[in-house]
């Protein structure tokens, strides 16, 4: 896996307009609706997250809910008010 990821990383680095995002999800949403409300507690679990893009540095201490706002910032798209995460970009 490491060797294959290295090859993917090298291919992305060779492109000037490509971003590589690597993460894992060990949160879960087995019960989305328990009491009629969305259960988002799983979005606070820590997960690995790496961004390979020139000029982008991530802060530490993020959570799963911060990944989508980070991707939106990279894409220069405004974060919806419903999202409670914050971008990991310093």
Annotate each language-model stretch with its function.
Residues 1-90:
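Feature captures the catalytic ectodomains and active-site-proximal regions of enzymes
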């Amino acid at each position: 896996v490491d060797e294959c990821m290295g090859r993917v990383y090298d291919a992305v680095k060779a492109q000037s307009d490509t971003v590589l995002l690597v993460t894992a999800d060990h949160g879960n949403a087995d019960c989305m609706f328990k009491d009629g409300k969305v259960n988002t507690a799983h979005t606070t679990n820590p997960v690995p997250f790496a961004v390979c893009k020139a000029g982008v540095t991530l802060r530490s201490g993020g959570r799963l809910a911060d990944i989508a706002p980070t991707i939106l910032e990279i894409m220069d798209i405004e974060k919806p008010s419903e999202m409670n995460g914050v971008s990991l970009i310093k």
